[in-house]
Amino acid sequence: MERPGPSDGSDASGPDPQLAVTMGFTGFGKKARTFDLEAMFEQTRRTAVERSRKTLEAREREEEMNREKELRRQNEDLEPTSSGSNVARACSKSSSRDTSSSESDESSDSSDDELIGPPLPLKMVEEPVNPMEEGVLGPLPPPLAEDVEEEDDDDGDSEEEENPVRKIPDSHEITIKHGTKTVSALGLDPSGARLVTGGYDYDVKFWDFAGMDASFKAFRSLQPCECHQIKSLQYSNTGDMILVVSGSSQAKVIDRDGFEVMECIKGDQYIVDMANTKGHTAMLHTGSWHPKIKGEFMTCSNDATVRTWEVENPKKQKSVFKPRTMQGKKVIPTTCTYSRDGSLIAAACQNGSIQIWDRNLTVHPKFHYKQAHDPGTDTSCVTFSYDGTVLASRGGDDTLKLWDIRQFNKPLFSASGLPTMFPMTDCCFSPDDKLIVTGTSVQRGCGSGKLVFFERRTFQRVYEIDITDASVVRCLWHPKLNQIMVGTGNGLAKVYYDPNKSQRGAKLCVVKTQRKAKQAETLTQDYIITPHALPMFREPRQRSTRKQLEKDRLDPLKSHKPEPPVAGPGRGGRVGTHGGTLSSYIVKNIALDKTDDSNPREAILRHAKAAEDNPYWVSPAYSKTQPKTMFAQVESDDEETKNEPEWKKRKI
């Protein structure tokens, strides 16, 4: 940068005498400075190069520190020791001092350059200038003590990132009472505004976090599947529909307010090939929405099929997947799920196998592991990680296993000693994919159910939460809210959260006070206390109970005395005795009993003498041919038997 000398400036830019006379002063003070654009551009280029070099050095130092931490983690336990952290901190401080010294040297070299801008005040020029401050653009760095504090904060943040247990939001909890029976289904919409619960009591209840207060009451309760247990509830990826899977053979889809949108059709159970039916023919187990395609979902059933459906076409399924054993026989799928991108369909079967299909190829599975869990047990849950490469399975053999679908020939890890007694016990991944969560079951009065956390990288049991004195059936870790929902075997649903780590959800309703119940306005009859009131307004004095009962006994209305029979003609809607009117007398006489109890032989012989004296019918016909009446002779049975032939006689 060029500065004009005093001699040059006096000739070129001296005061104009005419202007001085007009304005009343002799000069304008200091002279304007000139700037060299090329020098300014060169200075800017140097600054950019220096900053990029510092950024690259910082990245290299960070990579070296990460490599050192990985080596220490492999050689030592899970948590880094204090000595290792001190060494790393000392190394980082020494490297920072080296870089600061090199930066000071370079800045001192560049301090010889000329200044840019107007001249500094006199006080600042007289003060000693730190060579570190000349080449710095922007605000000055903080003191050394603050640097040390920031380094400590960074170390704390890195330790928190390394230790995923600190990210578990379990400092606070709320309890939602669904009912008295097992909470077998949980669902939370993608935004985290509404929670839906279902249980063995056939009820589905809706909970709105923004609308609830500290009483935690559901705003709607219904029974969408009548007398069938609710097995699965899941919101669609848009949050406007809920898939309801119950113990029946027909799944239902309802909207956010509980109104039915569609119901799957039931298939023909008399057809052998289940692919030729239009729907399921046996009890359902679970269901799942497609993560990408709106309106598509999947169900599995006891008819040994996994079917995909569309909301727009409830009269027939979209496709059918038929799990098979290695011998080609039918096998019942107990749970199913989509991968995170929706390209794969995974199902766990009763023979202990896990089968994975390509969604567009329904014939043969893409992956098939036949002994994933013990045969004859119900695998209750399979779920994919958020990165889509790892599959977790919760078996009925009290195990939790982790699988890599890129090498689906053996499990990566396996954890045992996790009892389960429900066919819908859940397992899920944390939002950062570093933890796996599942629940345990207990007998009544034999302990408390737990929520167990495993680290995905080492599969070590790193944390446990005692939920309640009942089994833990369902668990759900919402990625947006960072809150954990748990369904238990005693009808409770619990929500775990941390005010500092969680968002919205349970935090919205905890701060609201419970509304006071409105007192019902009851109208009571006022007593007339004045003793000299009119008789029609006067009320009787309160008597003793015994006297009041005796008086009520004499009252036919209060004692419910039966009505006496009506004498004479009927009245008051009651029929009187017979014969009171002409019509009743006629009816009574018509309906008389006229049965003849006389002897018929005597009645005939009564007319025998008259018939003999005055024959009219039979006797005149025989008067000439047979004037004397002849009767047949009575023969004994012995004579009849004698006249019979020998072959007709009875043998004794």
Swiss-Prot record:
Gene3D superfamilies: YVTN repeat-like/Quinoprotein amine dehydrogenase. Residues 92-102 have a biased composition (Low complexity). Residues 1-22, 45-171, 538-577, 629-652 are annotated as: Disordered. Pfam families: WD40 (PF00400). It comes from the Eukaryota. Residues 103-115, 146-162 have a biased composition (Acidic residues). The modification Phosphoserine is found at S619, S636. WD repeats lie at residues 178-217, 225-266, 279-319, 328-367, 374-413, 419-464, 467-506. There is a cross-link at K294, K588, K594 (Glycyl lysine isopeptide (Lys-Gly) (interchain with G-Cter in SUMO2)). Belongs to the WD repeat GAD-1 family. PANTHER family: GASTRULATION DEFECTIVE PROTEIN 1-RELATED, WD REPEAT-CONTAINING PROTEIN 70. This is WD repeat-containing protein 70. It comes from Bos taurus.
